[in-house]
Amino acid sequence: EDLSFKYEHPEAYQQIEEKLKATQAERTNLFEEFTAPIREQLDKMGLPYRILARIKSPYSIWNKMQNKHITFEEIYDILAVRIIFTPKNEEEELNDCFNIYVAISRIYKPHPDRLRDWVSHPKANGYQALHVTLMSNKGQWIEVQIRSERMNDVAEQGFAAHWKYKEGGGSEDEGELSKWLKTIK
């Protein structure tokens, strides 16, 4: 989509790229400030985790601007936060997702209409995650996606990645599958 957008609408693509670059430092600061108290809570929970910033693609930004008739500055979800954790065990994966949700909702006020539970009710393609939108201390809504490592692998590599968890993981074939999937991405 981004590649097509770049060549179909080069001026719009360039304008969005320039605005993304111009606001990058602001987004980085917001990410660091927003995630610092989340990291403290997750450390207390004792689950291994990583937190990533997800930046909306130029095409997705443009598409939202077109569909909602809004400006670049009016798009609140250019930055999203992704929490990827390793559950205590397979049986606790769902509970761990919701425990993380509860912990971060104590730090930041959740948007009452923006909780998406694809953990209890996965999408047809196998996608699972909790998406919640939280109000930062700077008054910005920020989407947070909560996923286990398994859920992240399925989201990034497709449902075929799910088999390694069913088989116990760690096989030589798993590495070959990952290499192959990266070549076709």
What are these regions (language model features)?
Residues 1-185:
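Nucleic-acid processing machinery
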